[in-house]
Amino acid sequence: SRSQMGGYADDPWVPLNWLIQNRVKQLCPKKSDGRFFPTLNDSSGMSRLELIDWLKGIFERHHDAKIAWIDPFMEDVGIELLNRLGTATADYLVITTEKMSNDDSIKEADEPNRVENLLARCSGWNNGYFGSVCLKILSVPDKKLHDRMILIRSANGQPLAGYHLSNSVQRASEKHPLLVTPIPLDVIPQVFEYVDQIIQSTLYGEGNPHLPARIIFNSADISPDLLPVD
């Protein structure tokens, strides 16, 4: 007998089935951690609420993690969101700069600037309802920060998740939309190493008596106010 190789053709329904599957994946893609928040005008005012829900979900999912929120122009609104949405079992680190924002440049001389407003928001920490989370705010040199990110690692330092933000959360939806892009797991270790190097070189630099970074707020240094006894 004689064997013959090849000559097999798929049944007619096979390519059609693949075509349908691919089309369904395009129309109904698997839900990712990425988000797009339109401006308030383009979302009938809903995008701000959706953003708050997204942040709340991130903080609750990582309720006992170490979370770094990096924003060169962090404002008091961001601190308020951390306090409202953060958990008491996580550690939060805000990394920002003391660079003047565009709003600062148009303020009157006697008006508080961005950083002053931020610290004023922290001044009532552990006073009543405000300030239930463990928070540090690190100010680094202007040139060290550009991107806005939220980076999450476990208590033992293992990277868990990361998100790149197209603009500042506190300004999101006012004039520009906000795109949140998950950082791929194979890239996250490099991002953490980059941020750790910024902290190490500016806050703990060996042999430099004039370190350019400083912790401008640490909730651990604030003692809770004693409540009056009836």
Where are these regions (language model features)?
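PLD/PLD-like phosphodiesterase catalytic module centered on the HKD motif
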Residues: S1-R48, K56, R61, F73, ...
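Structural motif
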Residues: K66-A68, A161
